[in-house]
Amino acid sequence: MISSVPYRERQSIGGIRSCPHSPASSRFPRVNDSAPTVFQGWDVPIGTPISMNIWNTHYNKDFFPGPTEFWPERWMGEGTRELEKYLVPFGSGSRMCTGQNLSIAEQVLTIATLFRNYELELYQTTKKNVVMASYCMISLPGSESPGIQVKVRKTVQ
């Protein structure tokens, strides 16, 4: 999927990795019902629900070196297929969201249309204003941040 898409799609993919729609979301838990299991030194008894968290997966340094950096180029070249296994904002496996490709296409078209029709300039915005600091059910900037402020001018066509 990702290995054959243009740079703008890689930017979109980088964005949904670094700032997922719902970082607290996780896969539907599976229940360990076959045998007691040991995971990283922890005993996991039979009947224990097991799941994963999007945020912890997307910010795991073992999967994504420099996880806090927005780096669309990580989705280019060799190793891309391996990274795709850890990109889970749409879930994974048989229960993966069927709208994944549509969502990415909509993001790319929206951004392209926005930049084609408008000139955008950051206004009184620093990196501190956009670093995600609060995570519960949605991605949010820090409580002191006014968010991203932008001056918008219509482009003459």
Swiss-Prot record:
Which residues are recorded as binding heme? 97
Biotechnology comment: Terreic acid is a metabolite with antibiotic properties. Terreic acid also acts as a selective inhibitor of human Bruton's tyrosine kinase in mast cells and other immune cells.
Which terms are listed as keywords in the entry? Heme, Iron, Metal-binding, Monooxygenase, Oxidoreductase
Q: Which domain of life is it from?
A: Eukaryota
The record, for Pfam families, names: p450
Presence of the UniProt keyword Oxidoreductase in the record:
yes
Q: What is the required cofactor set for this protein? A: heme
Which molecular-function annotations from GO does this UniProt entry contain? heme binding; iron ion binding; monooxygenase activity; oxidoreductase activity, acting on paired donors, with incorporation or reduction of molecular oxygen
EC number(s) per entry = 1.-.-.-
* Coiled coil regions in record: none
The intrachain disulfides are: none
Pathway where it operates: Secondary metabolite biosynthesis
Q: Is Ion transport given among the entry's keywords? A: no
Q: Per the record, what phenotype accompanies loss of this gene's function?
A: Abolishes the production of terreic acid.
* PANTHER family from the UniProt entry: CYTOCHROME P450, CYTOCHROME P450 12A4, MITOCHONDRIAL-RELATED
Identify its protein family: Belongs to the cytochrome P450 family.
* Protein name per the record: Cytochrome P450 monooxygenase atG
Provide the species name: Aspergillus terreus (strain NIH 2624 / FGSC A1156)
* Classification of source organism: Eukaryota, Fungi, Dikarya, Ascomycota, Pezizomycotina
